Regions:
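A general secondary-structure signal for short beta-strands and their flanking turns/coil
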Residues: 34-36, 65
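Hydrophobic/aromatic-rich, well-ordered segments within soluble, folded domains that form packed cores
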Residues: 53-56, 182-183
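Helical hinge/lid and interdomain linker segments adjacent to catalytic or ligand-binding clefts
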Residues: 15-31, 38-48, 138-224
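Beta-strand secondary-structure signal
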Residues: 38-40, 53, 69
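An acidic, glycine-rich "communication" segment
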Residues: 216-241
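Short, surface-exposed linear patches
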Residues: 102-106, 185, 203-205, 231-232
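Glycine-rich, phosphate-binding/catalytic loops in enzymes
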Residues: 98-100, 198-200, 227
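Aromatic-Pro/Gly-enriched surface loop or interdomain linker
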Residues: 1-29, 51, 58-174
Length: 241
């Protein structure tokens, strides 16, 4: 990308958009956004595997922006498979204001037990630890954690594919298409199926590199969406034994 770290894959709009409601919070602090669709998009078949950032902006307020990250899962065989830590992104996500899996803004001590759920159906707001950078709003932890390694790997010419935590949970065959799984920086929240799939692949010869700290620390349990019934749209942390 000539040092730019990425390239423009496409653009669209403008779109007519209204104010979407902030969903009510359940007893487990779960907020699920059952919003009206402003626009939809089908990923073209010729797009390569990668981590993409859709940047949303307002035509009436220049400079107001937010990202929407998404992963195009690898379909081809690659030497390396970089897994983004999207479950950890959501665990620390404080959208709409203070509601991460750790706290609700009511006290100085973080909660580390069970019985708190977070939904994947909500935007990424401010990340509740380490970094407060308005220009990264909406990107989860990607620009903080994954991007520096991805930038370097692609600049060095490595053969890289990409997947999300959710891909590893739902599709063990994603590991059949690579020689090595790479976990980056802060990959804290894993499901049992993720762990079992990675372990089975390792026993079959897959290499696994954890270029990270605090990895595979919390086991989670997935739940179906309370609004659509779609599987694996919310999760809770299991109690540490």
């Amino acid at each position: 990308y000539n040092g730019a770290g990425g390239r423009l894959a496409g653009s669209g709009g403008p779109f007519s958009a209204g104010t979407q409601p902030v969903p009510m919070m359940t007893v487990e602090r779960l907020r699920t956004c059952d919003w009206d669709i402003t626009a939809d998009f089908t990923i073209p078949d010729d797009w390569c595997s990668g981590i993409y950032l859709a940047k949303l902006g307002r035509t009436d307020k220049p400079g107001w922006q937010s990202y929407v990250p998404f992963v195009v899962k690898t379909r081809e065989a690659t030497d390396l498979l970089v897994q983004v830590s999207d479950l950890t992104w959501q665990a620390y996500n404080k959208w709409p204001a203070n509601d991460s899996i750790y706290d609700d803004g009511s006290g100085p001590v973080w909660y580390s037990g069970p019985n708190v759920r977070v939904s994947l159906d909500r935007p990424f707001a401010r990340y509740c630890q380490i970094l407060d950078a308005p220009l990264s709003i909406g990107s989860g932890e990607f620009l903080l954690w994954e991007h520096p390694l991805v930038f370097w790997l692609e600049a060095q010419g490595y053969d890289v594919g990409y997947c999300s935590n959710l891909d590893l949970h739902l599709d063990s065959k994603v590991l059949d298409r690579t020689k090595a799984l790479v976990s980056v920086a802060h990959d804290e929240y894993w499901s049992r199926d993720m762990f079992d799939n990675a372990l089975a692949a390792r026993e079959d010869g897959l290499s696994i590199a954890f270029l990270s700290g605090n990895a595979v620390y919390h086991e989670i349990e997935f739940y179906d969406s309370e609004t659509t019934g779609e599987p694996c749209r919310a999760f809770a942390r299991r109690e540490l034994m």
